[in-house]
């Protein structure tokens, strides 16, 4: 920190340096540390950064895009499935949101987990205005988020599961 510049801590509280003092330490950098540092988080962040450098963001992005498009192509023509979003762009966020008929999104998500151990995020996704615009305030939507850790086989299983659920809804 530049000489003469005063920084105020975002939070203050216990300190590992002056444990029993009722006043927060004033010396830097301890003055900016409230409580115990998240050592596990710091170590995890370091490992994550090493992994990203080794694997490469381009490789990760390409894999996520490939899986997302595989999934989209696999469900887009299933009767009763309504997909939300702009799929006219080749590169997009590797997320697909959809509904199956009038099926509540939470029910679809539960069925996917119970029948196929597929984890999804149903509901309003902290985006009430989006759901208002889509007309899905009551139903919500089912969201698949793809990672480069997912496999082609997992995507094919998800497509088959959605086909089966859509048939059951008819």
Residues covered by each model-derived region:
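Pyridoxal 5′-phosphate
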Residues: 1-170
């Amino acid at each position: 920190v530049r000489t003469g510049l005063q920084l105020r801590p975002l939070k203050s509280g216990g300190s590992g340096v002056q444990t029993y003092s009722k006043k927060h330490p004033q010396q830097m950098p301890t003055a900016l540390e409230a409580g115990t540092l998240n050592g596990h988080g710091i170590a995890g962040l370091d490992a994550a950064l090493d992994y990203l450098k080794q694997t490469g963001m381009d490789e990760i992005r390409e894999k996520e895009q490939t899986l997302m498009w595989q999934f989209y192509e696999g469900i887009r023509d299933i009767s009763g499935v309504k997909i939300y979003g702009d799929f006219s762009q080749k590169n997009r966020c590797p997320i697909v949101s959809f509904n199956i008929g009038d099926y509540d999104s939470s029910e679809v998500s539960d069925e996917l987990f119970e029948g196929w151990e597929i984890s999804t995020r149903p509901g309003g996704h902290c985006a009430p205005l989006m759901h208002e615009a889509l007309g899905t305030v009551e139903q919500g939507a089912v969201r698949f988020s793809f990672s480069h850790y997912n496999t082609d086989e997992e995507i094919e299983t998800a497509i088959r599961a959605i086909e089966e659920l859509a048939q059951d809804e008819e």
